Amino acid sequence: YFALSTEDAHGNNTAIGYEALKTQDAGADANNVAVGHQAGLLVSTGTLNTLVGAFAGDALTTGTNNVAIGTYALGAEDGDGGNVAVGAGSLMLLNAGGDAYNVAVGFEAGKALSTGVQNVVMGAFAGDALTTGNQNVAIGYQALGSEDGNGKNIAIGHYALNAQNAGADAYNTAVGWEAGKLINTGVNNVLAGGLAGDALTTGSYNVAIGHEALSTEDAHGRNVAIGHRALKDLNVGADGYNVAVGFDAGTNLTTGTNNVILGAVAGDALTTGTDNIAIGIGALGAEDGHGLNIAIGTNALTTLDAGAQGHNVAIGYNAGTAMTTGLNNTLIGSYTGDALTTGTNNVAMGYGALGSEDTGGQNVAIGVNALNTANYDGNGLNVAVGYGAGAAVTTGV
């Protein structure tokens, strides 16, 4: 009844429902489709609109190129276009004052958006607090559900960035189930993975990629955690400057800072240790509370837990692999010093160098298999330089 009741001379319109397109008289073929009670009720000269649902696009007058599907969808926009609203109440308050190019799909998706533009909002209640925010992407149930006036965020996943309302363009990216769900004013974070960075509130400049990566840190930043549960327990109380890459890399680190951990289960026992470098599967795998060690290579320094700042350097496959409480050792080469446990102040460079010494110290072995059989169990004070140098020495000093 009263559908398309004003149009006089032009066509290519479809109006189905009480007062659908009632006031349209475009002066040309309008190519509008309105289906539903008072759908497109006030459209006068607007064209190329598709409006389906009771009261869908019912405030449109001259707006063009809009799609509104669902009860009250796009219910306030009058003179502009380029919007897609699919879902009951989606974009129901939008009236941007210009072509807005918003996309909202889902029940009440973007329902509070008034003048914000260029947003993509998909999922029930996704971006439902946005008013003037621009250039956001929110995909998932209640994704980006608190941000109102700012933009340039990407939230993809159930509850992703749900609490964010930074007070400025935040440039956060969160992809995954509840990724970054508690961030409120934190900015410049990149979070990808289920529960990645899900405790962050005001923390900024973090990168967390992987399931439960960086999932305890709340208020601080400048950490990089890449891998399943990487830096899972970290909550330093200050900017941490930790880098952990690998499965469970640095997973138990709590308040340690300035660590670089690369490799599956590398540095996975560290809690409060600082200034360590562990690169390789299992590297520095037992140290918890201390630092100043460098372990590069599979299982390098894997059993070290010195009880003090270690100042050990081990580079090579299984270099220093048996060391427990030794200090101030420099071991470079595969299997160098691989029997050392409590020995200190040793230098071994070359494949298999100082390969039998366990508790002794103050030896210098440079060369393949140099001092390979030496095991003095005291301060050996031996110096051997060259291929196989001192290879026959066992207990000599």
Give the residues covered by each predicted segment:
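Glycine- and small/polar-enriched repetitive beta-structure motifs of secreted/surface proteins
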Residues: Y1-V397
